[in-house]
Amino acid sequence: MNATYRHITVLLEEAVSALAPREDGCYLDGTFGRGGHSRALLEKLGAGGRLLGFDKDPQAIQTGKALAAEDGRFVIVQRSFAELGDEVRARGLEGRIDGVLLDLGVSSPQLDDPERGFSFLNDGPLDMRMNPGQGISAAEFIANAAEEEIARVFKEYGEERFAKRMARAIVQRRQERPFERTADLAEVITVANPAWEKGKNPATRAFQGLRIHVNNELGDLERGLDAALESLAVGGRLVVISFHSLEDRIVKLFMRKHAKGEADNLPRDLPIRSKVFEPRLKLLGKPQYASEEELKANPRSRSAVMRVAEKLR
């Protein structure tokens, strides 16, 4: 990457505060990115504190390695946070993590660097993979998927109401030549979109759906939440920042499910109720959003919502 793309960490102080960091605590940043949350958290930890960072992005890993070289309390791992359970177990830390942070937003360097293929505003190769060395690219998916599958991805993951029209236009155009550039795909999608939303690029939802599918973002989120709960110590905090309704719905339902427990599903006249049916999480406060001040400084924070829970057992 030749250019430097600035990233502003969303809900920085709020997220670190929500973790209630202890100086000698052991924490996990499941979405290291460019290290904004990790650096702020390290400032709260003492000499005995530890922080484990995860990311799939090779550029994020380079940033993480630089931070690890200057601060021995930090370790960076090139894995999806969906695999954090395996890593935590391998390090003998299961049930000993004091806080897990997941910031689910795509970082600005990823969005703004045309070579990563995420942007419909800046032309680049149609890739969209968080880790370009793994999985199929967006171009490969668009080239080989059936029209119905493309429409499903746009509708299910992008919540795009004109998904079928867009998929049909894509399949018709790819018979002439393959899609290799983001601008090329964005142009076809734009023409197929008959009703643009004011203030929103007509390719926004379709590109979101494609990115989520290529990176299995929702599946990873479900696995990561389960693994985070098992990794936490009793009293440990789970802090999740999501950026669209599909993510937030998964986070909300997960936290509510474990805050409610399974007692309601049992017969009322049972003489003894096992603890395995009791709640595992306690919800802490209401969802938090970016302040007016943060919105002015970083418009991309407008869709961020943070939810916090504490492990009970």
From Swiss-Prot:
Q: What is its main location?
A: cytoplasm
Sample GO molecular function, one term: rRNA (cytosine-N4-)-methyltransferase activity
What's its catalytic activity?
cytidine(1402) in 16S rRNA + S-adenosyl-L-methionine = N(4)-methylcytidine(1402) in 16S rRNA + S-adenosyl-L-homocysteine + H(+)
Instruction: Provide the binding site for S-adenosyl-L-methionine.
Output: G35, G36, H37, D55, F81, D103, Q110
Report the leader peptide range: none
**A Pfam family for this UniProt protein?**
Methyltransf_5
The UniProt record lists the keyword Transcription regulation? no
- One GO BP: rRNA base methylation
**GO cellular component terms given for this protein:** cytoplasm
| Entry function | Specifically methylates the N4 position of cytidine in position 1402 (C1402) of 16S rRNA.
| HAMAP family registered for this protein in UniProt | 16SrRNA_methyltr_H (MF_01007)
Provide the protein name: Ribosomal RNA small subunit methyltransferase H
